[in-house]
Amino acid sequence: MKIVEVKHPLVKHKLGLMRAADINTKDFRALATEVGSLLTYEATTDLETEAIEIDGWCGKVEVERIKGKKVTVVPILRAGLGMMDGVLEHIPSARISVVGIYRNEETLEPVPYFTKLANDVEERLAIIVDPMLATGGSMIATIDLLKKAGCKQIKVLVLVAAPEGIKALEAAHPDVELYTASIDSHLNEHGYIVPGLGDAGDKIFGTK
């Protein structure tokens, strides 16, 4: 599995701000979008382009455009919504596919409750966004759903990832690509990433 830890200074700086215990909802939400945007830039460097001719200000000019059906953004509800706009800043015409999965806090197992995928999801690059890759259960379940729908190319964008989650994801889906702002130390006994960001969903939605 391709694993990319994006070490750009802007990513490090913004993620460092997000780790503060006293960060407010407004700032956390804005930074989640910004880091999501920077991760998107890294994850789309291999998009295929094609040359086309258009009318420029001084006549015909050859330019490059993204080729064919492009992207569907797949936020995992609810926290993934906090990163979605960062992707759409670069790919505003992307289709949105929504997957609702929550983690049972006792068993730590994923529980799916909602799925609405783009009609042509099998023809698109799926970019899954979720702030945390902890145990990997929710991400694996989401990829299972996408592959069952015929999706062949999948990339995962997360703010922070635990080694345990990376290992589980690689074992289940070695063909996907993972882009993260940080590979953190470990999971604690409650299944939270250390040092992590705390509960990203609560911080994005102001329910902490």
Curated annotation (Swiss-Prot):
User: Keyword Plastid on this protein?
Assistant: no
From which domain of life does this come?
Bacteria
Annotated uracil binding lies at 193, 198-200
Q: What UniProt keywords apply to this chain's record, in alphabetical order?
A: Allosteric enzyme, Glycosyltransferase, GTP-binding, Magnesium, Nucleotide-binding, Transferase
Q: What class of enzyme is it?
A: transferase
**Pathway(s) it belongs to:** Pyrimidine metabolism; UMP biosynthesis via salvage pathway; UMP from uracil: step 1/1
**UniProt-annotated binding residues for 5-phospho-alpha-D-ribose 1-diphosphate:** 78, 103, 130-138, 199
- Annotated InterPro entries: PRibTrfase_dom, PRTase-like, Upp_B, UPRTase/APRTase, Ura_phspho_trans
Ways its activity is controlled: Allosterically activated by GTP.
* Gene3D superfamilies membership: 3.40.50.2020
| GO MF | GTP binding; magnesium ion binding; uracil phosphoribosyltransferase activity
Q: Which reaction is the catalytic activity of this chain? A: UMP + diphosphate = 5-phospho-alpha-D-ribose 1-diphosphate + uracil
**In UniProt terms, what function does this protein have?**
Catalyzes the conversion of uracil and 5-phospho-alpha-D-ribose 1-diphosphate (PRPP) to UMP and diphosphate.
The UniProt family comment states: Belongs to the UPRTase family.
NCBIfam families in the cross-refs: PRK00129.1 (NF001097), upp (TIGR01091)
- Name listed for the protein in its UniProt record: Uracil phosphoribosyltransferase
**Source species of the chain:** Actinobacillus pleuropneumoniae serotype 5b (strain L20)
